[in-house]
């Protein structure tokens, strides 16, 4: 088998739990050193896909490579080269930062544990907090500890499952700065997230719903492929206007964005014909470029729920 040039190069990945298909025929290619975003609603199959990639869960179908290794037959070797950060903080809260990292180094049977722990502490700016109990850390510092633990064995690929969920905006920004620094050094990332601003920080991204891959590419490519026409409406009586236009021919979504409405549709002819009678009601109508959130809401609303 020829070694793939991609860090992740898989196709046809499928997983079923009973009669339910939770990951359906997914293909993905992620380049070395790339930050690849994986988006989708809760229960869409993101975590299941990550767990199959790193060998924690056996796929029912699919083929391909992860870090040049057959992702189905060589999962034990893949685990040694991958760092996996789970959604839930899973470290010992009654141990210090340093003790937690030393414990992880022991699990990997590292011969130079002390040096590895020191490097992780320094890399994530935790030298001065090394003796602090993990249970007393803020959400942002807990995420730093989790990232440090993922890095301690010098992996080539990091799988981060909603790493900034529940973290304040500044901590999220700092966390992403660390990710970009690490990616610049050649580390590859596959990151699940719900946040549109985080999706925009990724080199490329994919969107999954109900186990099906609905879109992939750069932000610009995904937005263009969405094919949406979007109007931003500001002014008075927006709630009443929203009720009147919701459900009209060509109108796919009516969403409140702060003090404005975003109204979108794919069939431009039907869409504009339905909205024309309302454009002289005193509100301000501005045609804008559709954003990721507009596209993803549209994808979600048109996706078939095969989980029910």
Regions found by a protein language model. Name each.
Residues 54:
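Helix-to-loop junction immediately C-terminal to a conserved catalytic motif
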Residues 62-70, 77-78:
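Conserved ABC transporter NBD signature motif
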Residues 94, 133-137:
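Conserved ABC ATPase signature
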Residues 102, 106-129:
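Conserved ABC ATPase "signature" region
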Residues 158-161:
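Catalytic Walker B motif of ABC-type/P-loop ATPase nucleotide-binding domains
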Residues 177-266:
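ABC transporter nucleotide-binding domain
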């Amino acid at each position: 088998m020829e070694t793939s040039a991609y860090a992740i190069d898989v196709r046809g990945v499928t997983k079923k739990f009973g009669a339910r298909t939770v990951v359906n025929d997914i293909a993905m290619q992620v380049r070395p050193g790339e930050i690849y975003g994986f988006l989708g609603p809760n229960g869409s199959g993101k975590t299941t896909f990550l767990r199959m990639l790193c060998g924690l869960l056996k796929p029912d179908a699919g083929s391909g490579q992860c870090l040049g290794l057959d992702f189905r037959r060589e999962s034990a070797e893949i685990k040694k080269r991958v760092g996996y950060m789970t959604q839930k903080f899973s470290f010992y809260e009654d141990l210090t930062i340093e003790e937690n990292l030393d414990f992880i180094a022991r699990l990997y049977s590292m011969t130079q544990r002390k040096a590895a722990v020191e490097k992780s502490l320094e890399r994530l700016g935790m030298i001065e907090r090394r003796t602090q109990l993990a249970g007393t850390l803020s959400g942002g510092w807990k995420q730093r500890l989790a990232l440090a633990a993922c890095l301690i064995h010098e992996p080539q690929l990091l799988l981060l499952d909603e790493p900034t969920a529940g973290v304040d905006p500044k901590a999220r920004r700092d966390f992403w700065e660390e990710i970009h620094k690490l990616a610049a050094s050649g580390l590859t990332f596959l990151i699940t997230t719900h946040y549109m601003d985080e999706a925009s920080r990724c080199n490329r991204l994919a969107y999954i719903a109900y186990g099906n891959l609905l879109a992939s590419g750069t932000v610009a490519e995904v937005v263009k492929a969405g094919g949406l026409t979007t109007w931003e409406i500001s002014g008075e009586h927006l709630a009443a206007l929203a009720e009147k236009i919701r459900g009209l021919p060509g109108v796919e979504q009516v969403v409140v964005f702060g003090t404005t409405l975003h109204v979108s549709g794919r069939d431009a002819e039907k869409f504009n014909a339905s909205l024309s009678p309302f454009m002289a009601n005193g509100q301000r109508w501005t045609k804008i470029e559709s954003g990721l959130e507009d596209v993803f809401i549209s994808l979600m609303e048109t996706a078939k729920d095969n989980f029910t």
